[in-house]
């Protein structure tokens, strides 16, 4: 498997602006993929100039063809539920822009693993689209469109070509399109991904200085205290102090789920 084969057959546009292409295969229902988010964000913040990130959804075509399940027989009250709905919904959100897709994916993780909501429910996915202020009518139309299914089929094809059989999986490609990709399945320490990136670039990579806290909340919707501490290489206590300053300034707001505290830009 090399990048030339994948790119020719998947019709995904390539770019030469950065030396590395990084494909990350994610399953919206996978807890490891949720845990991966802080690592991936930090990698983007520090080394974004070295790689182009492509998020692909890990799924399988047979499951896409299963009929939907209904919670009850009342057609007016029924809420359609199916395990493939979250994947379809992320793709539908992507049709409103790459960032919309990433924000939707993050919100699916939040609803599933923090709020314990059933993200396989169509009505819950529509609620997420509303929360993110997407065009909900467009989202619903795209959800059942052939274009979304074609986009998912591209991800399925890429996973097959890259021999990806689980999420989360990273696949790194260097500047030579004939070289094999380097596949890393599962979760590892941040330094492992740094080392791989450096080896593929072929020189010492220098991390970018993290942006001001306000800019961070412009880029990412929701962040945890420990994630912010890690990004700025400070203690959690120091991070919380800075966050509370912004809280008093009414720039951000705190949201708590059981024993987890998250922060986001204040909703108007």
Predicted segments with their positions:
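Flexible, glycine-rich phosphate/dinucleotide-binding loops
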Residues: 31, 62, 179
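A short beta-strand-turn-helix
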Residues: 2-20
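Short, structurally constrained coil/turn elements
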Residues: 16, 47-49, 248
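Local cysteine-cluster metal-coordination motifs and their immediate loop/turn environment
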Residues: 28-35, 169
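Short, flexible turn/loop "capping" segments at secondary-structure junctions
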Residues: 15-17, 82, 220
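A generic local structural motif
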Residues: 8-11, 39-41, 156-157
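Structural alpha/beta surface segment adjacent to cysteine/selenocysteine redox centers
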Residues: 23-25, 34-122, 225-228
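C-terminal cap of thioredoxin/glutaredoxin-like
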Residues: 25, 119-268
